[in-house]
Regions:
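Short amphipathic secondary-structure patches
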Residues: 49, 53-120, 146-148
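Short, solvent-exposed coil/turn segments
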Residues: 10, 108-110, 138-142
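Alpha-helical assembly-interface signal, strongest on the long, hydrophobic N-terminal helix that forms
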Residues: 2-77
Length: 150
């Protein structure tokens, strides 16, 4: 049997034609969507950890006046991670999520710091699935975090 007939009989060359199709299938339908999900997940986890770290930093240096956050919030927001800026800090007293003032800041009421940051994701493949935010940019998500301090 000749060499050409031998190769055609066991079809060893067929894999050379199948590999590009399999590679394209794996890249477009499996790996790129998984990469999109992983990138969004890492960005979310990083932002949430930045919020937790910020909460710990202000937990160990409490505000001098819980009824007036405007006097100290500018200095503490400067301590936040620059990749995840925190626009404002709100002090909430009690379980009703009301902003602290002289009427609801009794020592028996629990007090919380509440603050937010925004992340923007740029998925390559799964834009219609991952970009579902109600913000003006559907790929931008606002994360809220609260830390009890009293």
């Amino acid at each position: 049997m000749s060499r050409k007939i031998s190769l055609m009989a066991d079809q060893r060359g067929a894999v050379a034609l199948e590999v590009p199709a399999v590679w394209l299938f794996l890249m477009l339908l499996v790996i790129l969507p998984l990469a999109d999900i992983a990138i969004v997940g890492f960005r979310y986890i990083s932002a949430y950890q930045a919020l937790r770290t910020f909460g710990q930093s202000i937990l160990y240096s409490p505000p001098p006046d819980v009824t007036n956050a405007s006097t100290w919030s500018a200095t503490v927001t400067a301590k936040a991670d620059s990749r995840y800026p925190i626009p404002s800090v709100k002090l909430v007293c009690g379980e009703s999520n009301a902003v602290c003032d002289s009427t609801n800041s009794a020592a028996t009421q629990p007090k919380y710091y509440v603050y937010t940051t925004t992340i923007t994701v740029t998925p390559l493949v799964l834009r219609s699935v991952l970009c579902t935010s109600s913000n003006s940019n559907p790929c931008s998500f606002t994360l809220t975090y609260s830390e009890r301090f009293q």
